């Protein structure tokens, strides 16, 4: 057999990869970009990745359908969609151990495995979680987020920040600090066309580009509306202000009205029932309580605690709704409210779909009925198939292990 030079290939320089693509051969070069060989001629394949390839010394390449991965010596991996001509760079600021990629391969689950200069990384390309800000601690510790009037608001231990929601994965986006909000921010409520922000310093109300600080209330952890009462909100507070406070809309302005009588506990997790004047409140010491408020909302007229020997207090408990059921997420597993017996019962059905009888610290169901939850110090995902009406877990649906703030986790699926 005799080897012969492919006509026109002199311009390629050093070749980093030969890949089958649409019945032809896609050629990745070290510095000169991409080319296509159709069996007769070599032609330049122009793409948005040309500049990346010219400046970062492409060492290897892999192809998965129309997704081309280019491993570089100087700046990690360039992911190029050959059909859309869109690219994304994954490097140290996206979580790689180092920038030098010497080999790569896609697996059967479409994950990209990288052989680095020192170590091996796996990029979960099908993961629903990606970094907005790289590895940089841009805004300190995060506690909550919400999209309001086209802007993404982020609550942190440093105050309130805002930016535009990003549609590009693993791309750092600029942050703007909201002046006057320095300190611990806890949670948000989009209500009455306004954004209510709960914080150590009380409640901030954002209305478009304007912001107002409500005087007379401090240490606010969360805010909830009451069914059939559009002119009031209940604020759960802690510390020296522990208890429940009522906010009232008067002449178009929201303002603190009074502190409810007969309840002086810290309110870490707060949830209102869809009818009546019933509230669920949790804290570490008191456990889970269901409160009934008076018709004039001046006081708590009934309080029942739901902890018992198999479900003791002493740990933080998170309240959530799963398919219209009230669920307590705890160190002792998942418990749901049985209205017929007025008790919390073990939620074996849901536990069996998740991690069994385990310690859970967070759980939420998104708009597509997927269930996000935290156990074993990691965020996990139970996927819902609307066509089959079934739930399933993928092997790599475990994220951010060891990076979460226990009992203060938050997931906001906004798109």
Tell me what each language-model feature is.
Residues 1-415:
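Carboxylate-rich, polar loop motifs that coordinate divalent cations or form catalytic acidic clusters
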């Amino acid at each position: 057999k005799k080897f012969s030079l492919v006509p026109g290939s002199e311009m390629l320089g050093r070749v980093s990869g030969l890949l089958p693509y649409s019945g032809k051969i896609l050629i990745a070069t070290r510095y000169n970009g991409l080319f296509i060989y159709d069996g007769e001629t070599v032609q330049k394949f122009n793409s948005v990745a040309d500049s990346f390839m010219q400046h970062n010394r492409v060492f290897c390449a892999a192809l998965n359908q129309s997704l081309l991965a280019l491993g570089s010596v100087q700046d990690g991996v360039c992911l190029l969609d050959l059909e859309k001509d869109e690219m994304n760079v994954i490097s140290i600021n996206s979580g790689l151990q180092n920038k030098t990629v010497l080999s790569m391969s896609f697996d059967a689950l479409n994950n990209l495995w990288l052989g680095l200069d020192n170590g091996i990384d796996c990029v979960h390309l099908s993961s629903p979680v990606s970094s907005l800000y790289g590895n940089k601690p841009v805004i300190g510790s995060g506690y909550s987020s919400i999209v309001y009037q086209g802007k993404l608001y982020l609550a942190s231990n440093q105050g309130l920040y805002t930016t535009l929601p990003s549609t590009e994965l693993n791309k750092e986006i600029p942050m703007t600090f909201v002046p006057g909000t320095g300190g611990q921010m806890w949670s948000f409520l989009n209500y009455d066309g306004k954004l209510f922000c709960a914080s150590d310093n009380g409640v901030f109300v954002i209305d478009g580009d304007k912001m107002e600080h409500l005087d007379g209330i401090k240490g606010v952890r969360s805010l909830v509306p009451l069914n059939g009462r559009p002119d009031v909100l209940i604020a759960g507070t802690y510390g020296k202000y522990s208890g429940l406070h009522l906010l009232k809309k008067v002449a178009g302005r929201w303002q603190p009205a009074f502190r409810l009588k007969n309840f002086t506990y810290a309110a870490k997790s707060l949830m209102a029932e869809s009818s009546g004047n019933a509230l669920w409140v949790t804290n570490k010491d008191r456990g889970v309580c269901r409160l009934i408020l008076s018709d004039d909302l001046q006081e708590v007229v009934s309080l029942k605690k739901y902890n018992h020997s198999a479900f003791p207090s002493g740990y933080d408990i998170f309240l959530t709704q799963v398919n219209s059921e009230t669920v307590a997420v705890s160190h002792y597993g998942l418990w749901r409210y049985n209205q017929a017996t007025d008790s919390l019962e073990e939620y074996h059905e849901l536990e069996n779909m998740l991690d069994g009888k385990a310690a859970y610290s967070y759980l939420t169901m998104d708009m597509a009925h997927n269930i996000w939850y935290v156990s074993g110090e990691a965020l996990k995902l139970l996927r819902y198939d609307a066509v089959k009406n079934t739930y399933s877990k993928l092997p790599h649906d475990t994220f951010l292990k060891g990076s979460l703030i226990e009992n203060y986790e938050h997931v906001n699926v906004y798109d």
